[in-house]
Each structure stands twice: as structure tokens, then as C-alpha cells.
Amino acid sequence: MSSSASSAGKSSVSSGSVKGTAALGGVVLGEGRTKVIVPVTAETFDEIAGQTASIAKLGGQTASGADIVEWRMDFLSPSIDALTALERLADSADLPILATFRTADEGGKAIEASAYRDLLLAVARSGKVGAIDVEAFRDESTVREIIDGAHEAGVAVVASYHDFHATPAAEEILARFGAMDAAGADVLKLACMPASVDDLLVLLSATHQASRIFDRRAFIFQHGPSCESICKRI
């Protein structure tokens, strides 16, 4: 892979040369083969080193078995400075970094709204990441401030929404994607918890419609053990 974590933040933000594509740290989503994103959920510096070493040993379609590292900052110990941890991660992971802080509202850790904003902006401006994840349905002005700040730093933005209790109707999914698109995100992401075949069909329909409506790259993720059992029954 030509893009390294340490240079990813210097790449320009782009929606890709083809409708439905997006460039994150030099890796184009929606073009060519399926891209592999591997999470780092380290609490300590030692765990950062250990997890990135494990990623490097993976087999797969690229030399390291992955295309992008998703750094889950909400797993990091409060005693460790996030930017120092990012330096360590960028030095050891020769891949573009997608930086994510998942808040308690969407299955992660509690954080004050101002601290969430300041952290994402600092990470985006660090020159060490290719993209940041922004929870799209927080305060609208804060979301736009984060997206604008990231773009000014040359960093792509993944707008996300998570519902771990149900599957929204297709109309709601498309409305949420529309709001993410209007806010200027480069990638639109929605994750939910299907409980039936009907739920899976809703997600397939919404995915198909989104691919025809939006120029941005849109992703829908299904979580939970029920998804696997439903697919087996199909």
C-alpha cells in the first residue's frame, strides 16, 4: 500500500472520480475490490503496539490484510493523551487511519459535547489521519463545525448513525442519509440490528435506493447474532 498512516492526513478530500466512491487517506471506497477496515481498540500504548503488530501479520488481499485502520479512541485509557497515542499508532500502522470516538448514545463511552468536538478537530488537524467518524445526529452546528474543520485539514469525514435496538424504515434510512449528505460528509454510514427477514429486505432496498440517489458512498451495516441466523434461514 502506497499510503501510510503518517501521510494520510495530507491527502485531499475527494468523493472519488466515480459516483458512489470516496477517498479516505488514498484508499478509494466503492472502487475495485472490497476494502478491509480493521479496528484498533487499545487501552494502552503496549496494546496499540500489540494490535498493530497483529494487523501486520494478517493475510488477505493486501500485504497486511487490511486497507484502513479504524482507531476507536473511546477504548483508550483516560490517563493517556489521545494525540500522543495517535503518534504511536501512526508510527506503527503503515495504513491510513480512520479515527472514531463512539459516544455512549451510540454504544461507546460518555464524553462532553465540547470535548467530543475538540478531540475530533485536534485529531483531524494532526496530519496523522485520513478520515474521522462523526456521529451525524448530535448538535447540528457542532457536526457542521467538525466536518468543516476536517475538510479544511484535508481529512475525509464518515458521518454515522447507530441503532442497536431496531431497523429503521427505508424512508427513515434515506432521510438520515440525506441529512448526512447535506452536512457535507464524504461517506454515509448507518448501522442497525435486524431481527427478521423483513428487516434485511428493508436494508437491501434502502441500500439500493441510496446508491441511486446519493453521490456519496453509502454503507449500511447489520449487527448482532440474529443477522447470521436470519441469513442462514434465507
What do the predicted segments below correspond to?
Residues 32-36, 65-67, 93-97, 128-130, ...:
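Short, well-ordered coil/turn segments that N-cap beta-strands
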Residues 102-120, 225-234:
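Cofactor- and metal-binding active-site motifs of prokaryotic enzymes
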Residues 136-234:
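Catalytic alpha/beta core domains of metabolic enzymes, predominantly
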Residues 32-51, 103-114, 160-171:
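Active-site mouth loops of central-metabolism enzymes
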Residues 82-88, 113-118, 170-176, 202-206:
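Charged helix-capping and loop-helix junction motifs
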Residues 1-50:
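N-terminal amphipathic alpha-helix/helix-capping segment at the start of soluble metabolic enzymes
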Residues 41, 68-78, 100, 112, ...:
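Catalytic beta/alpha-barrel core
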Residues 28-30, 52-63, 80-94, 120-127, ...:
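Acidic (Asp/Glu)-rich catalytic clusters
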